[in-house]
Amino acid sequence: MQSVFIEQAARVLENNWQDGFTIPCEGLYPFQWNWDSGFIALGWAHLDMERAKAEFRSLLKGQWGNGFLPHIIFHNESETYFPGPAVWDVGRSPNAPEARTSGITQPPVLGFVLEFLYDRSGETLLDFVREIFPALFRWHQYFYTCRD
């Protein structure tokens, strides 16, 4: 029975894979969401560690200059999703990245997800941890200095 659930979960992840990131739900959520990506990376860690790592890398393309990590990265176009990037108009901020994003964030789950990935893979993931950790640290600094 457990293998049936694993196969179904794998099928959902595969179907929602979008060339570098995974959408949470076809149609309803057509972009990359911050904490969804963390939980999605947990799933990918059981199936394909490279895709788990891709979730992080893709999400961090939306990190702002001040460390802020938004809740949505608009990697693609959608005429039906509201509020889209035009509503957020984050380009007005001097901290905004080139990527189109929202202007709010979500609870920071990526730290414990990174810990899980490392615990699962050990030393083979150390270079990835070294790559990602500074961005996660900057995000937590943002919370401490701007949201505390």
Residue ranges of model-derived segments:
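Helix-terminus loop motifs that line ligand-binding clefts
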Residues: 49-130, 144-148
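Short, solvent-exposed loop/helix junctions and linker helices
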Residues: 31-34, 104
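Hydrophobic alpha-helical hairpins/lids featuring a short glycine-rich hinge
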Residues: 136-137
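Conserved H-X4-D acyltransferase segment
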Residues: 33-47
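Low-complexity, Ser/Thr/Pro/Gly-enriched N-terminal "stalk/linker" regions
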Residues: 1-32, 53-54, 58, 66-72
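Generic anion/oxyanion-binding catalytic loop in active/binding sites
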Residues: 29, 41, 99
